[in-house]
Amino acid sequence: MADTAAVAKGVENLSVSASKTKELKGTEKRDTLIEIEKRYQQKWEQEGVFEVDAPSTAEFPLDAITPDELRQKHPKFFGTIAYPYMNGRLHAGHAFSFSKIEYHTGFARMQGKRALFPQGYHCTGLPIKASADKLVKEIEMFGQEFERYKEDEVVEGAAPAAAAAPKTKEDLTKFNAKKGKTVAKTGGAKYQFQILKSLGIPVSEIHKFADPQYWLHYFPPECKKDLTNFGARIDWRRQFVTTDANPYYDAFVRWQMNRLLELNKIKFGKRYTIYSIKDGQPCMDHDRSEGEGVLPQEYTALKLKVTEWAPKAAEALKGKLPEGANVYLCPATLRPETMYGQVCCFVGPALKYGVFKAAENEYFVITERAAKNMAYQGIFEKEGVIEKAADIVGSDLIGTLVNAPLSVHKEVYVLPMDTVLATKGTGVVTSVPSDSPDDCAMMTELAKKPEFYGIQKEWAEKEIVSVIKTPTSDLLAPYLVKKLKINSPKDAKQLLEAKELAYKEGFYQGIMNYGDFKGEKVETAKPKVRQQLIDAGDAFAYSEPENKVVSRSGDECSVALMDQWYIDYGEDSWRTVLYDYVENKDGKGINTYYADTQHAFKGVIGWLKQWACARTYGLGSKLPWDPNFLVESLSDSTVYMAYYTVAHWLHRDLFGREKGKGNIGADQMIDEVWDYIFCRTELSDHLVTKSGIPKETLDSMRREFQYFYPLDIRVSGKDLIPNHLTFWLYNHIALFPREYWPKSVRANGHLQLNGEKMSKSTGNFMTLDDVVKKYGADAARVALADAGDGISDSNFVEDVADNTILRFYTNKEWIEETLKDESLRTGELNSFQDALFDNEMNALVNEARKHYEETSYKLALKAAHYDFLNARDMYREACAAAGIPLHKDLVTKYIRLQALVITPIAPHWADYVWQECLGEPKSIQFARWPEVPAANPALTAARDYVRTTSSAINSAEAAQLKKMAKGRQSDFDPKKPKKLTIFATENFPTWQAKYIDLLSEVWDAATGTQKIDDKELNGRIAKMGEMKKAMPFVQALKKRLKDGEPAEQILSRKLSFDEKATLLAMIPGLKRTAGLESVQVVLVEEGSKTGKDLTNGGAEIEVTAPMAEAALPGQPSFFFTNV
């Protein structure tokens, strides 16, 4: 074994780019909070706090109570996240998805539910095996500790792959994963050992990963450690690894596949699939480093027979083809119905083409890439064999004469087109200028500049005939080119627009205007024309990936037509059931939380078809009826949530080496046992005998499934909607009774870090371990909650986590000190400071509950954390200004409520406060959500009044000083002692009466709703002639109504609180916060020159300040003077 000291410096220094993440300056407060977190994590583990079981069959016999009745007595919650793949450490993006289940589980516990959050580890498929095999080669190249690796070979941050050119038609229902994620994860590292080193694995240990099984032993414990440090409420008894490394899970997957086969959901036959020639097998989504979600695109490939070679082509091919060979240029088209209008055939002048043997005496002129696809689709004579007779450049082909099948022009010429791509189709394009704006523009260009392009003018002047008639034109492409003022093939933006318009109108509204199907709709004629061409031997089916796909082994993939086992997703009856379930019209389907998520699912259901479910390379469970194949990774991961329910009955360790509480051997888990557990069949004596499992044990496992199923929520990134999440739903519908289908799914956007995409190559990247070590678990969890909800991308902001450390530490210190404070008030609560604070806490508890129930965690955090702290601080300031201590009962109530409402998000801090500050005997993880009275609308209105009035006073002073600067005021000096006069009124201006009457007419007090829509209401207001001042007035009244203030008070033009008493109570606080020497409150009436000084017993005084007239009930006006 090599001395580690001798390892090349290049390896030792290998790292991701310098970190762009925030640098912390002091860690004492953080370290204190982390010490608390570690203490409570240990307690939770020792006490088995998160181990959750269904009610036993001893307490409730299986046949004595239905699952629904049992859940009524003992409510449950069951949530899962897509299990992570075990080829690396969890990163902050994983944590974001985990956090959603975490918060949900924590809140469910507080609702009194038995909340189950289990976790497994996905190891199936190509990635681990491919990485291990790469490592074997690298060890051969560089030595066991890579000591022969040279420093100048280090690739510190290869640039991400260039973005693909935009597609002409983008299917907005498809979510395609951006494989910049690969660069983000690897940091652009060139070799597998570099990737592993970037994960913090010592160089001396990396060689162990050449054994794929070692990955299964290394990464799952790391995953568990990271999630435990995060404070996850996971029942770790139920953890497992996939593949045949765990014989129990292996038995489960065999059952799943057997039953799908019996249901005729799995079939065998030839189908197009993305294929890696290098790997020798299909390349499914999880096997790809680029191109996740990409599907085969099927074309019609035409056979344009060469009738006369251009001189240069004849010279280039001289002696390379058999005498009398039939040679065809083979353009691939998506619009076979337009072939009647072919006027030429385009090639890229600079592109390299090959002349490939397709059959005896038959050759195709196409690109090398197209040949690779055709070789595996039964098009060439020998399967998988590419025989190239000659190479030729596109410029040599120009002027070649070819036969154009179906075209009104029997023979057409090969002409140049610079925009032909070698990476799309066959590199040969047939031209139909009647219906293709691109072709029309190019033909016009060629006819204008024949000498420039090296052609004869007449080659580009063949007559354009009408092939398709549309409502707009019989020659749609020329019409659009003229209308959009397209003057050149380089007018890309206009051409893209024209192409979209031409395709949509031609296909959906077009009528065939030429050929055997004249008069038929294009939609119905298209497949007929295609079949006619194929039957005549003038065309054949050809397929290729719709975009670039690269396997994890580095192979650019092709499409193969091959015999294989596939799951028949998209089969009509199956698809219809799923579509209806997702559409959820009757409210009994699946809840997707957001319309965008539902729309994405419906789109995928529309296009998703057969899916290859087996492969020959990688890790996994063997196909039961054909053990030469392995079940692929997106097919063994669709219903494993059901496995969670009984995993702890089967085994005690990840690999199933130690039997679980049921004392069952893996060989006893025959298909019939799974059928019984999952409520597909009833129990028989024969099954008990055959399996050797006692009836009591079988019943107990069935109880676990019956109780926890269906799954209440599944959380995953939105990029799994096109595959895993849709497969998950399809399989549940096929395998389980209706009452066990999933209830909800939440798709998240991707997580940004500090407003930028996470990427190792830029240094803007953090693992979950990094985040928790840097900020602690609770601060990280707060920042994840603050990052956002919904399907759009969210943003983890490190400043939020950093500031949370200070908030939690400071609040902890305040709580500890305040609980010891013997000067706190006792006795009755007062009607102002105490009453407002008490009411606000009640309101925030109920608001937080609502947001938790709606899984709106950013809003829940605002109510439960930020607003709770603000309410406390406002109470402290109000009491200090009034010269009174805080009330002991309210302080204790605040501390209890603050700990409880933040528990789902920040459980460590909450449990510390609960047990060590409040002295509660049991963990807060067992506490219930607090029951508090509904908020008093009058007190809520008074609280809002205090806040808005305080803010308005600050604004009023600034406005008055601004006027003074313009010469309008000269008698107020803000540097001298200040006096504030507050003008209040009890009556609304008379002009407002008619709008009050209007609102009374359209507001339904019984239901708390508006009888007419806003558009009609605004129209009626506009007709009354005072829109500018009336609209804000009506909107303010509507807001108060919607906020719950009694309608009779608002519509009778009364405030729900005593404004005069509130203003007088505010005076001490205003003096302190606004630096006032004196505050005077004057009650005024409309049109009067006098008012009542409420601060002087109601004495009548003269009112001269003009802003006195601006006062409204609930909206006082202000005037500053000097004392």
UniProtKB/Swiss-Prot annotation:
InterPro entries found in the cross-reference section: aa-tRNA-synth_Ia, Leu-tRNA-synth_Ia_arc/euk, M/V/L/I-tRNA-synth_anticd-bd, RBD_LARS1, Rossmann-like_a/b/a_fold, tRNAsynth_Ia_anticodon-bd, Val/Leu/Ile-tRNA-synth_edit
Reaction(s) catalysed (UniProt annotation): tRNA(Leu) + L-leucine + ATP = L-leucyl-tRNA(Leu) + AMP + diphosphate
Protein name, as recorded: Leucine--tRNA ligase, cytoplasmic
Chief location category: cytoplasm
Lineage: Eukaryota, Fungi, Dikarya, Ascomycota, Pezizomycotina
Ligase in keyword set: yes
NCBIfam families: leuS_arch (TIGR00395)
Any one GO cellular component localisation term in the record: cytoplasm
Annotated gene: leu-6
Entry's family note: Belongs to the class-I aminoacyl-tRNA synthetase family.
Organism (species): Neurospora crassa (strain ATCC 24698 / 74-OR23-1A / CBS 708.71 / DSM 1257 / FGSC 987)
Ligand binding (ATP): K760
PANTHER family: LEUCINE--TRNA LIGASE, CYTOPLASMIC, LEUCYL-TRNA SYNTHETASE
Keywords: Aminoacyl-tRNA synthetase, ATP-binding, Cytoplasm, Ligase, Nucleotide-binding, Protein biosynthesis
